[in-house]
């Protein structure tokens, strides 16, 4: 029986594309252009049908990753080491090429055949046709699509206006720095990784373009255009810091018993356990720009506080602080936080949530003397007390003083019986809690006809039903709250009727297994049942008598479909393309051949880099040809010179299958000539998404244009990307 598990997140939303001019003209001092509000009637998490080529390249990536993981598992199984101490790697995987395992050769051949035999079919419906048309319209648009901060809106913004808004937001809190600062931080990252013996696993911090979202929920938005600046550049050392902070936070939370909530459910449990609710009043506060406001001094005070509950070494403190040395990039130019320190708790960094939680526990410790039942979820605080309004006002002032002492600004409301906290409304008078929805923020869900794995769209209504039931006090509250959610489901193509379910907290115990996952992409236009064929291959290659059957069978190897790029990624690529148009155009690659372009092996483009090329070897006596497909991350001229050296030097005979063929012709004294041409270009290894488009494109051409790769071998599908090595901290020169 086919066992396919689909593990994918479904942040939700639905579909109609309408352009709405804002009620007021939006202008900016330097421009007469206006923002056009774009309300997508569908979720940007919806997935369009990909091209056959895009799908196949993703499938190649999945097969390559699966075989690599399986090689390592098989190698350790076949070569056991007694009493081997497991090294702490902080979640970083090895970057070493997997060892050769002959027992997997049949599997590799059959997976190769599976990829090249994939069949496609026509798949279309009204929703996908609409999505396809919208993507075409976006491709023709000259403006950028900027998301709203807390609503589902988007705004079409002229690129000049976007640049001005981004620049203004950056200059408010950051100042320019130079590459020496980047090198200094990278050197320190390498020192830490080397001490932990993981510098051969950790990549240098990738420079990622900062961006903004628009706070269209703020008053007078049309005239002020308030923005939120987001910095996606993340220090890889933050992953180590995250592990350390998780341990510290868990210990401090357990020993102090402070009300630090992890989610809405824990807040609801706290609310349910309140006695004499009618006598109580709420105290609610929000820490303004909490992440950005955490200073180095405050974090050091927090760590000193935590040391009363858990030992924290100087090395661990050093790692935590180093992870906060964050830079922001705009067009590859580095910016650093204003002031004398480069300390910055960037929202979205690997350890920012844990840092926020630890500082939150420290702040809660400073509020304990108030004798108020207070709790905190990240930057949102909530408490209750039975004091008089006058006494509560005094407590309010004291809370403000405490936060101000730590250079934190808060907004605070007191003496209320009803509050909206996270996604729940709490009522002390009635003792009831119910779902809360922000004003003008209608729910949107992924459409039933989105190109998601079927298990996701099938289980979506049940997941929404479970969530709404868990934040509803009873069936009556649930029924009153569901109309907008029911309508959103209907608009997204679902016929399911939401029905209240009593909260069942019993968790099913699952036996833990060491699973090796195969994660092929899913697309509705693929007629081949990839999951079923894959599992049949596992059965055929590893029968009960096989030496690896114990670790490679249907219980230990499973399939989990993953998603193709969604509509949000289409918008991001469009914005990147428009932004790049503002930069100076890239100069032609040119040629540096002594005889000029007329003798250039690549028609005057030999200085071009990051390309896949084809070499054609022709016997001049019989006109028979053989072809070879290769790639280079550097310039073609450098790679060409290496090929020429291999053709001349006996030691280079086995460097490539191309040089091996040329040497065979030379031994047989066969006259030949070699010609070269460019096939395609692609970006080299990206540490952010762990993908090398250049290598994937080469593998695709070898597999699906075999006439241009007669000298290449099938094993090249499983070659490890060499470009990733240059991105490792171990390769940084200090």
Protein language model regions, located:
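GIY-YIG nuclease signature motif recognition
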Residues: 213, 244, 286, 348, ...
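Conserved pre-motif C helix in the palm subdomain of viral-like polymerases
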Residues: 207-256, 288-293, 338-368
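Non-catalytic, polymerase-adjacent accessory regions of viral genome-replication enzymes
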Residues: 1-216, 502, 506-534
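Conserved polymerase palm-domain catalytic core
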Residues: 28, 32, 274-398, 402, ...
């Amino acid at each position: 029986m086919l066992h396919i598990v689909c593990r994918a997140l479904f942040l939700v939303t639905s579909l109609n594309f309408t352009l709405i001019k804002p009620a007021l003209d939006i202008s900016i001092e330097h421009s007469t252009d206006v923002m056009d509000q774009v309300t997508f009637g569908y979720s940007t998490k919806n997935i369009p049908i990909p091209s056959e080529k895009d799908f196949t390249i993703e499938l190649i990536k999945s097969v390559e990753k699966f075989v690599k993981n399986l090689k390592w598992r098989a190698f350790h199984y076949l070569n056991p080491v007694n009493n081997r101490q497991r090294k702490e790697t902080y979640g970083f995987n090895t970057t070493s090429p997997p060892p050769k395992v002959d027992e997997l050769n049949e599997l590799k051949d059959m997976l190769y055949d599976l990829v090249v035999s994939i069949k496609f079919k026509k798949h279309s419906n009204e929703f996908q046709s609409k999505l396809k048309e919208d993507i075409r319209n976006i491709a023709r648009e000259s403006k950028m699509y900027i998301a709203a901060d807390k609503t589902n809106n988007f705004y079409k913004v002229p690129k000049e206006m976007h640049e001005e808004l981004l620049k203004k937001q950056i200059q408010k809190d950051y100042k320019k720095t130079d590459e020496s600062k980047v090198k200094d931080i990278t050197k320190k990252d390498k020192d830490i990784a080397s001490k932990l013996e993981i510098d051969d696993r950790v990549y240098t911090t990738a420079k990622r373009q900062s961006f903004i979202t628009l706070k269209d929920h703020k008053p007078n938005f049309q005239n002020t255009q308030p923005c939120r600046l987001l910095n996606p550049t993340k220090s890889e050392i933050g992953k180590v810091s995250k592990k350390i902070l998780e341990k510290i936070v868990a210990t401090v939370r357990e020993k102090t018993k402070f009300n630090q909530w992890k989610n809405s459910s824990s807040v609801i449990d706290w609310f349910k356990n309140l006695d004499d609710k009618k006598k109580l009043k709420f105290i609610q506060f929000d820490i303004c720009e909490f992440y950005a406001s955490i200073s180095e001094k405050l974090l050091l005070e927090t760590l000193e506080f935590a040391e009363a509950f858990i030992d924290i070494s100087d090395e661990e403190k050093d790692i935590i602080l180093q992870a906060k040395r964050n830079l922001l990039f705009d067009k590859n130019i580095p910016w650093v936080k204003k002031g004398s320190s480069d300390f910055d708790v960037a929202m979205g960094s690997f350890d920012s949530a844990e840092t926020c939680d630890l500082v939150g526990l420290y702040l809660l410790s400073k509020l304990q003397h108030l004798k108020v039942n207070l709790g905190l979820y990240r930057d949102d605080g909530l408490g209750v007390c039975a004091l008089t309004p006058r006494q509560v006002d005094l407590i309010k002032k004291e809370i403000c003083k405490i936060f101000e002492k730590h250079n934190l600004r808060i907004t605070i409301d007191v003496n209320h019986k009803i509050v909206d906290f996270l996604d729940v409304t709490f009522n002390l008078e009635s003792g009831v809690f119910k779902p809360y929805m922000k004003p003008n923020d209608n729910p949107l869900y992924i459409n039933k006809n989105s190109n998601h794995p079927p298990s996701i769209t099938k289980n979506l209504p049940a997941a929404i039903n479970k969530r709404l039931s868990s934040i509803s006090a009873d069936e009556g509250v649930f029924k009153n709250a569901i109309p907008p959610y029911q309508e959103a489901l209907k608009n997204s193509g679902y016929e399911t009727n939401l029905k209240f379910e009593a909260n069942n907290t019993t968790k099913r115990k699952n036996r833990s297994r060491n699973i090796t996952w195969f994660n092929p992409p899913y697309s509705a236009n693929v007629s081949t049942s990839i999951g079923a064929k894959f599992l049949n291959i596992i059965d055929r290659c590893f029968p009960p008598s096989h030496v690896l059957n114990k670790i490679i069978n249907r219980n230990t190897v499973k399939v989990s479909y993953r998603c193709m790029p969604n509509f949000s990624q289409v918008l991001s690529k469009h914005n990147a393309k428009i932004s790049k148009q503002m930069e100076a155009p890239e100069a032609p690659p040119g040629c540096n051949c002594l005889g000029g372009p007329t003798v250039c092996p690549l028609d005057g483009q030999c200085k071009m880099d990051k390309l896949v090329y084809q070499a054609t070897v022709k016997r001049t006596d019989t006109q028979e040809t053989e072809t070879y497909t290769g790639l280079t991350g550097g310039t073609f001229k450098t790679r060409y010179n290496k090929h020429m050296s291999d053709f001349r030097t006996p030691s280079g005979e086995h460097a490539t299958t191309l040089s091996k063929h040329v040497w065979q012709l030379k031994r047989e004294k066969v006259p030949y000539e070699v010609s070269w041409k460019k096939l395609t270009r692609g970006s080299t290894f990206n540490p952010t998404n762990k993908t090398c488009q250049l290598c994937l494109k080469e593998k695709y051409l070898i597999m699906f244009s075999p006439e241009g790769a007669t000298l290449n071998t099938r094993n090249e599908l499983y070659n490890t990307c060499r470009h990733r090595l240059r991105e490792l901290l171990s390769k940084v020169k200090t």
